[in-house]
Each structure stands twice: as structure tokens, then as C-alpha cells.
């Protein structure tokens, strides 16, 4: 799950990580009130969307007067903003964050993530903040420091100090960085996060470190035990179809093709998309209906797939292990009738009671195209969209 900047900063503050004072606003007048409550300025007005790169898109403004605050907020709120990090999607700006604007002397980069290669929580730090870390890694990799944390010992204060010395910080800042890193480690573990990014982690004119911008991602599989994080979810920033899928316990990801996929099991779903690609087609989605492919779940799955007008055919690829193929076939038939599917439907069944399932499909009176195996089904799906 993604979070807004203001939500990330709320969590930072709870764990003692220094952040500029700030308030959110949903209107230009509220933004002015927020600015006045923070002092005499200057201020930063920042659009709150689930994407980075807001500055280049006009979503971050430096304001010296409350009139400028009002103008900046009015220009952002109620609009949709696309950035180079939003994957071509324009996201709605429903809130702005108004913060104090400190005088920056140096920008650093600091992140915490799970490194699958080393199977550890890993810190990435750089003396080059305020820019994409990927660019730094490509152009000046010597400016990046990494630290893999031993999961038994945990992060030790000396490790944070060592990173600080390598970044060229002064003694006071080295100690501040060590404390920030320890706080981030605790936050990361307490909340089951998958990413924390401070970019920039800035040195202000008084010599202190502050997290001027922050990004947090949490592990969706752990959300059930963090109701306080679940309450922060902003569905307006998400794909509507994916939101509906999650509400029905379906794993759905929108893609760019025209062949809808309905599969039980994530591994089989990925294999199905691969075989479609190998046969010259393009999948329109990833959709795992799970082990219990009931009529209700299959019906919802068809509705999700057909919510995209790009879909020209649907490939249903089901392996009946625990669930019998005849029960799955009944669910498919009922769902096709209820939804009123107008595009070709190719069905491949395999597993328990497969013959009974195929017989039900064959005698259903519906224009369902049977497939013998995954490759046959993919070929027929590709043929259906290229007619």
C-alpha cells in the first residue's frame, strides 16, 4: 500500500524523526489558514498524490506570501497530475500539504528496503539527494553507501555513524543520522513496511537534519494487523478496477493488452500471460481468482475483466485441484449468462472431474470455445482477437 507524503511524515514524527511543521488543506482558503498557523513564512505548498516527480509537474511551490500560498493551492486542488513516476496516469489532487520552508544547505538521500538478494533489511544512503537515486547509481555510483543489517543483531548505532562519516557529515550530523536510521529501522519493522525513502534528507542552515520529503510503502500481506495503516488508504489514488478486486479478495492488475485472463493460482496466471505473449498476443490483466473459483467469484472476475473496453477475448485457465472442474464449469456457465459476455470466451479446464466439466460446457448452449491445454487456449485467444 502506498501513502501520501503527509502520512509518511506523521509516522516519521511518531518515531522522533525530524520533519518540518506542516498541515494539510483541501481548499485554497484552508491552505492560507494552514500557512498562517505555521508562522510568517516562507512556506512550501505540495500536491498530495501517490507519485514522485511532483516538482517538475508543478506540484511543489515555494511561497513567500499567503497570497502566493492561495494561488498555488488553487492551481493544484481539483486537478489531475501526471508525473514521470505515475506511469502515464493522471492522479487527482484532493489535498495539499503546507509546510515551513527551511533554508537548505545540503540534500542527502536515505532509504530502507528489503534486499531480496541478501535477504536483509538494507539502507541506501547518498550525499546526492533531491534527485532520482537511479541516476546517481548510474552516473556516480561511488557516492552511494549501502548497509545490509543482520536480522539477529539489528541495526547498531556505530553502523549509522559509519554511514555518516562516509557521507562527509559533521560530528553533530553524524549522531543525528545514526538516531534517524535507528528510528527508521524500528518504524520499518513495527509497521511491516517494504520501503521508506527520505529524499531529500536535508541539512538546514542551522546544521540539523530534517526529512523534507518522505515516501512509504507497506506490505499488503501484513495490512490485516495494522488497522491504523489501513485507515490511511486513499482509494482515489488507485485504479478503480484494482480497488474493486481487492474488496472481493481477487488479485487483479491492469495491463495494456486485449486478452482478458482469468486463472486460479498466481503461478499459473503468470504462466498464462507468458504463453499468450509467446503466441503473439497481449494480456489485458493479471487475475488470480484463488483456490475457490465459485460462481460468485467467477462472476465478479468477468465483470472486472469486461470493465475494460480494450478486452476482445477472455481466456479462462483453471486447474481443478481442491475445487472440482464440474463445479468450476457450472460457475463459468452461470457467470457468462449473468454478465452477458459478448466477447469470445476460451476455457481450458484440467484436474478433478475434468471430463464432467467439459461436458457441462459443451452442452451449455453458450459459445464457449474449449481448449485442450494452455498453449492451445492461448493460440485460440490470440486468433479470436486477430480476426
From Swiss-Prot:
Which residues are involved in binding Mg(2+)? 199, 213
Q: PROSITE patterns of this UniProt entry?
A: ATP_GRASP (PS50975), SUCCINYL_COA_LIG_3 (PS01217)
The keyword Hydrolase is annotated on this UniProt entry? no
Question: What is one GO biological process annotated to this record?
Answer: tricarboxylic acid cycle
Span of domain ATP-grasp: 9-244
EC? 6.2.1.5
Keyword terms, alphabetized: ATP-binding, Ligase, Magnesium, Metal-binding, Nucleotide-binding, Tricarboxylic acid cycle
Cofactor list: Mg(2+)
GO MF annotation list: ATP binding; magnesium ion binding; succinate-CoA ligase (ADP-forming) activity; succinate-CoA ligase (GDP-forming) activity
Question: What is the similarity comment for this entry?
Answer: Belongs to the succinate/malate CoA ligase beta subunit family.
| UniProt protein name | Succinate--CoA ligase [ADP-forming] subunit beta
The gene that this protein is the product of is sucC
Amino acid at each position: 500500500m502506498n501513502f501520501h507524503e503527509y502520512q509518511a511524515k506523521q509516522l516519521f514524527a511518531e518515531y522522533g524523526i525530524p520533519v518540518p511543521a506542516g498541515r494539510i488543506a483541501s481548499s485554497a482558503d484552508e491552505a492560507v489558514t494552514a500557512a498562517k498557523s505555521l508562522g510568517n513564512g516562507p512556506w512550501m505548498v505540495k500536491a498530495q498524490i501517490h507519485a514522485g516527480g511532483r516538482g517538475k509537474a508543478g506540484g511543489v511551490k515555494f511561497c513567500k506570501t499567503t497570497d502566493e500560498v492561495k494561488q498555488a493551492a488553487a492551481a493544484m486542488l481539483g486537478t489531475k497530475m501526471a508525473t514521470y513516476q505515475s506511469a502515464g496516469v493522471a492522479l487527482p489532487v484532493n489535498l495539499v500539504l503546507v509546510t515551513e520552508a527551511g533554508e537548505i544547505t545540503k540534500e542527502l538521500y536515505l532509504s530502507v528496503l528489503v534486499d531480496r538478494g541478501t535477504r536483509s533489511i538494507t539502507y541506501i544512503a547518498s550525499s546526492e539527494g533531491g534527485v532520482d537515486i537511479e541516476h546517481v547509481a548510474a552516473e556516480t555510483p561511488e557516492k552511494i553507501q549501502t548497509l545490509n543489517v543482520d536480522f539477529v543483531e539489528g541495526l547498531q548505532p556505530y553502523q549509522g555513524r559509519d554511514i555518516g562519516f562516509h557521507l562527509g557529515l559533521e560530528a553533530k550530523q553524524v549522531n543525528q543520522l545514526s538516531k534517524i536510521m535507528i528510528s527508521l529501522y524500528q518504524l520499518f519493522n513495527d509497521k511491516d513496511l517494504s520501503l521508506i525513502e527520505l529524499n531529500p534528507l536535508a541539512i538546514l542552515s542551522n546544521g540539523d537534519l530534517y526529512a523534507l520529503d518522505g515516501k512509504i510503502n507497506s506490505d499488503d500481506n501484513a495490512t490485516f494487523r495494522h488497522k491504523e495503516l489501513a485507515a490511511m488508504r486513499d482509494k482515489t489514488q488507485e485504479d478503480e478496477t484494482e480497488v474493486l478486486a481487492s474488496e472481493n479478495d481477487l488479485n487483479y492488475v491492469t495491463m495494456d493488452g486485449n486478452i482478458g485472463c482469468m486463472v486460479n493460482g498466481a503461478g499459473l496466471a503468470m504462466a498464462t500471460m507468458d504463453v499468450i505473449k509467446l503466441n503473439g498476443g497481449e494480456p489485458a490483466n493479471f487475475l488470480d481468482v484463488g483456490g475457490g473459483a465459485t460462481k460468485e467469484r467467477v462472476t465478479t472476475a468477468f465483470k472486472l475483466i469486461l470493465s475494460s473496453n480494450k478486452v476482445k477475448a477472455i481466456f479462462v485457465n483453471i486447474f481443478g485441484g481442491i475445487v472440482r472442474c464440474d463445479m468450476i464449469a457450472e460457475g463459468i456457465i452461470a457467470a457468462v449468462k449473468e454478465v452477458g459476455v459478448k466477447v469470445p470466451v476460451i476455457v481450458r479446464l484440467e484436474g478433478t472431474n475434468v471430463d464432467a466439466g467439459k461436458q457441462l460446457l459443451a452442452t451449455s448452449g453458450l459459445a464457449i470455445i474449449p481448449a485442450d491445454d494452455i498453449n492451445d487456449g492461448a493460440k485460440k485467444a490470440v486468433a479470436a482477437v486477430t480476426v
